[in-house]
């Protein structure tokens, strides 16, 4: 992955019945409830608003969306809540549920593959989100089956900006990483930390601020937007880019399967079109926040920004290659995923393609159009999820 010195871009019991009501000029409009664990005014909540606006637009007012940010369902409640009809639609973080979404999580967990490509850090999450959506829609019937088993239909993904080391002490090379207590947010980063001599520590995201400020951990592996989302900018003294890399892409925008079946084909197409907007706005929001936060950190004298040493980058790439082989057997043995190695090989060229496709994208609107043109518009709404 290339880390550009200059930003690539910068611009300021039964399912809920899809409720009918009248709008001026539009009869029989329907409202879809959408739950997200993101708090109001966050990147995720704003993406939810974009989803609602796009739904009304693309359906010519036939479908409306009521967004419930961090109120109707938490992230931990969303899969069961959408399954049981507490919400018609919601944002599911699949890594939180390893037994329910193993095939999906396999694709999400290999995101450190980005470090073996020429993807700029600024567009890495955009590429991975596109690749995940294409893979789940077109190449992973097992993934679709996992959502359907939860009475849900997958309608899109998303991706964060790259993960890096946010620390309270300089960690620029393997020697400085040795023995450090590192808060991790995913299995792949835990394995990376352990392999490179650090001690992975499991800390809930909302407790990361306190853990860093009190020295419970020396570093956390997070993306740059968390500098403001979790206010880590206040307690971090050193940021190291270039390692470990990878993005969080275990994001599934879903709709209750019974709700989906109650829509006609044109309405399903409108839902997918709006979901392409949500995927783009979520991924773009993280990418843009990462650029802004890194620029802010550069201006603060109390924060030093480092690039990982060449030795650390080389060792990271070695780890990624080794881990890919081990991951296939792990998912097969632990979760019963058949053909895990073939799944990984299928995903690789899709990711490479998307690294190129997002190159030069300069707005969330352009990204949404790209997602729609390349993937979402090609989904067979007469069969998908039914």
Predicted region positions:
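Bacterial N-terminal signal peptides that target proteins for export
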Residues: 2-16
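N-terminal secretory/targeting leader peptides
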Residues: 30-123, 150-386
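Sec/Tat signal peptide C-region and signal peptidase I cleavage site
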Residues: 22-29
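Intrinsic disorder/low-complexity signature
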Residues: 5-8, 25, 93
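Short, solvent-exposed loop/beta-turn-alpha elements that line the ligand-binding surface or hinge
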Residues: 114-149
């Amino acid at each position: 992955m290339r880390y550009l010195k200059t930003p690539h871009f910068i611009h300021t019991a039964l399912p809920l019945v899809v409720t009918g009501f009248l709008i001026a000029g539009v009869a029989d409009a329907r409202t879809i409830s959408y739950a997200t664990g993101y708090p109001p005014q966050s990147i995720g909540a704003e993406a939810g608003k974009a989803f609602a606006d796009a739904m009304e637009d693309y359906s010519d007012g036939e479908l409306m969306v009521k967004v419930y940010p961090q109120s109707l369902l938490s992230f931990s409640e969303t899969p069961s809540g959408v399954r049981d009809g507490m919400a018609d639609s919601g944002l599911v973080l699949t890594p939180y549920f390893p037994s329910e979404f193993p095939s999906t999580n396999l694709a999400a967990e290999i995101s450190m593959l980005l470090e073996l490509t020429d993807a700029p850090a600024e567009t890495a999450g955009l590429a991975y989100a596109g690749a995940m959506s294409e893979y789940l829609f077109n190449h992973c019937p097992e993934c679709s089956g996992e959502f359907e088993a939860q009475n849900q239909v997958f309608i899109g993904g998303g991706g964060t900006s790259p993960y890096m080391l946010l620390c309270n002490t300089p960690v620029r090379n393997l020697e400085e990483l040795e023995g450090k207590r590192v808060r991790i947010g995913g299995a792949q980063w835990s394995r990376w930390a352990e392999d490179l001599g650090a001690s992975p520590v499991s800390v809930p995201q909302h407790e990361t601020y306190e853990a860093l400020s009190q020295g419970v951990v020396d570093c956390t592996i997070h993306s740059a937007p968390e500098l403001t989302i979790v206010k880590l900018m206040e307690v971090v003294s050193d940021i190291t880019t270039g390692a470990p890399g990878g993005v969080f892409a275990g994001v599934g925008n879903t709709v209750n399967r019974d709700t989906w079946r109650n829509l006609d084909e044109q309405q399903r197409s409108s839902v997918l079109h709006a979901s392409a907007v949500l995927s783009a706005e979520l991924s773009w929001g993280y990418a843009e926040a990462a650029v802004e936060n890194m620029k802010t950190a550069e201006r603060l004298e109390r924060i030093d920004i480092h690039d990982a040493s060449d030795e650390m980058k080389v060792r990271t790439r070695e780890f990624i290659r080794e881990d890919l082989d081990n991951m296939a057997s792990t998912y097969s043995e632990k979760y019963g995923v058949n053909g895990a190695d073939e799944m990984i090989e299928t995903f690789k060229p899709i990711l490479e393609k998307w690294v190129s496709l997002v190159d030069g994208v300069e707005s969330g609107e352009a990204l949404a159009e790209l997602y729609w043109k390349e993937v979402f518009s090609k989904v067979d709404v007469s069969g998908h999820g039914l």
